[in-house]
């Protein structure tokens, strides 16, 4: 039995879905524990792409059960559409392999509308996906939320909707002056979706607990990345949930279950979608080259990702925040055959040199300390035994600065293009 957590170690989009899909081959459960359909995971199998937003990456493996934990904010419209889209591709999804926590907080039309009008009416853009994630978490924390199980009870759903709409109605009508669905319109839509999706509702807490007790392999699949964590991230340019390993405990399982591996997924360079500080961002042709070669366009938003050199002070910070045991390095092939290759090993900040970021640091004011690395060249024939010396040096530089080993290396989009230096499912 192995308990494995997959955490994004940057600002999201690191390739978590690819690693989760690969590990799912040996997993009994793959669990989503936070976020919502603002996540976007791309899986490539036999040259065919599959895009996932809510459903865990284990869905492509028939023996693997997929769990959406109670820490996820659930858009029932998005879930229904994703199930329908995947089933149309011949991917089996049923109440036998998909389990959705009855306690997931529901995203309504009101949340999505509020998300959109706030972003368009503020001078400080956060770069929200507009999926209603933040407003749904607000309702959850303020105890105005609607749970998945509430969709199955007409009286309860109507009363919870009335509570949720009470304040928002004033905002829509008097402040933002926008049209919004009536309570009855929203009720009719959500109740109908509830009847359709009820088959997937489950006590996921007990499902996970029993799987661990039975010695099953469980993989927890994070969304976004540590640097977007509402507490640890680059606030206010963050998401609304705990994207660090702490999110597993609050969103899926109990603190009584330890983890055998906490794998930090990171690209061989750095990307960011939306607003916020980015110390190593490249504004020149090199940045454009990485963006083009890496296909850096958001799966969820369609926005072009900002690109820059690998930032080791931030990676070390992420490792500390989530107690990472190792790094899974992705998209190494994007850096192949570059004329110039650099990595950030530290910052100059307030008259000092620092080598690990921390919560109070102002990343707008740091000056990255960049070192030149020898460029390397790899192709699909790369193995652990024929790896170029320059690439080995690049990997060793990362390990030495962050203080944990690199346990796998991805050098292409498909699940076959990964070198594993460690068996995550092997004890000891």
From Swiss-Prot:
Q: Where in the cell is it found?
A: Cytoplasm
| Range of residues in the leader sequence | none
Reading the lineage from the top rank, the first entry is Bacteria
Statement: the UniProt record of this protein carries the keyword Cytoplasm: yes
Binding annotation for IMP: 13-16, 38-41, 129, 143, 224, 239, 303
Q: Which InterPro entries match?
A: Adenylosuccin_syn_GTP-bd (IPR018220), Adenylosuccin_syn_Lys_AS (IPR033128), Adenylosuccinate_synth_dom1 (IPR042109), Adenylosuccinate_synth_dom2 (IPR042110), Adenylosuccinate_synth_dom3 (IPR042111), Adenylosuccinate_synthetase (IPR001114), P-loop_NTPase (IPR027417)
Q: Entry cofactor note text?
A: Binds 1 Mg(2+) ion per subunit.
User: Where does it sit, as one GO cellular component term?
Assistant: cytoplasm
Query: Can you tell me which residues bind substrate?
Result: 299-305
Binding, Mg(2+):
13, 40
Q: What does the record give as the function of this protein?
A: Plays an important role in the de novo pathway of purine nucleotide biosynthesis. Catalyzes the first committed step in the biosynthesis of AMP from IMP.
Binding partners and assembly: Homodimer.
Recorded protein name is Adenylosuccinate synthetase
Protein's organism? Francisella tularensis subsp. mediasiatica (strain FSC147)
Q: What is the lineage of its organism?
A: Bacteria, Pseudomonadati, Pseudomonadota, Gammaproteobacteria, Thiotrichales
Q: Gene name on record?
A: purA
């Amino acid at each position: 039995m192995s308990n494995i957590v997959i955490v994004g170690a940057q600002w999201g989009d690191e390739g978590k879905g690819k690693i989760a899909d690969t590990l799912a081959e040996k997993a009994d459960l793959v669990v989503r524990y936070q976020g919502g359909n603002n996540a976007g995971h791309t899986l490539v199998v036999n040259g065919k792409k599959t895009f996932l937003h809510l459903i865990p990456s284990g869905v492509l493996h028939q023996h693997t059960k997929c769990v959406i934990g109670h820490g996820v904010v659930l858009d029932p419209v998005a879930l229904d559409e994703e199930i329908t889209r995947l089933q149309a591709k011949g991917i089996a999804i049923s109440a036998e392999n998909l389990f959705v926590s009855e306690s997931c907080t529901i995203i309504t039309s009101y949340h999505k509308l509020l998300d959109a009008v706030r972003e368009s009416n503020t001078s400080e853009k956060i770069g929200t996906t507009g999926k209603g994630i933040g407003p749904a978490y607000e309702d959850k924390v303020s105890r105005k939320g609607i749970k998945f199980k509430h969709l199955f009870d007409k009286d309860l759903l109507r009363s919870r909707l009335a509570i949720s709409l009470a304040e928002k109605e004033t905002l829509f009508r008097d402040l933002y002056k926008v049209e919004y669905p009536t309570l009855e319109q929203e009720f009719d839509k959500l109740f109908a979706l509830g009847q359709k999706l009820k088959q997937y509702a489950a006590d996921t807490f007990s499902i996970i607990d029993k799987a661990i007790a039975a010695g099953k392999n469980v993989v927890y699949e994070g969304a976004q990345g540590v640097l977007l964590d509402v507490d640890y991230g680059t606030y206010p340019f963050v998401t609304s949930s705990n994207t660090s390993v702490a999110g597993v405990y609050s969103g899926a399982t109990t603190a009584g279950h330890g983890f055998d591996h906490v794998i930090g997924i990171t690209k061989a360079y750095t990307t960011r979608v939306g607003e916020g500080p980015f110390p190593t961002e490249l504004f020149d042709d090199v940045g454009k080259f990485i963006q083009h070669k890496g296909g850096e366009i958001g799966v969820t938003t369609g926005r072009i990702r900002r690109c820059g050199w690998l930032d080791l002070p931030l990676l070390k910070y992420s490792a500390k925040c989530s107690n990472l045991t190792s790094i899974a390095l992705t998209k190494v092939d994007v850096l192949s055959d570059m004329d110039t290759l650099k990595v950030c090993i530290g910052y100059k900040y307030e008259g000092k040199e620092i080598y690990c970021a921390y919560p109070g640091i102002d990343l707008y004011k740091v000056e990255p300390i960049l070192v030149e690395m020898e460029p390397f060249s790899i192709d699909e024939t790369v193995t652990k035994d024929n790896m170029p010396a320059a690439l080995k040096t690049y990997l060793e530089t990362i390990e030495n600065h962050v203080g944990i080993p690199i346990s796998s290396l991805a050098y292409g989009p498909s699940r076959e293009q990964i070198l594993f230096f460690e068996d995550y499912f092997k004890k000891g």
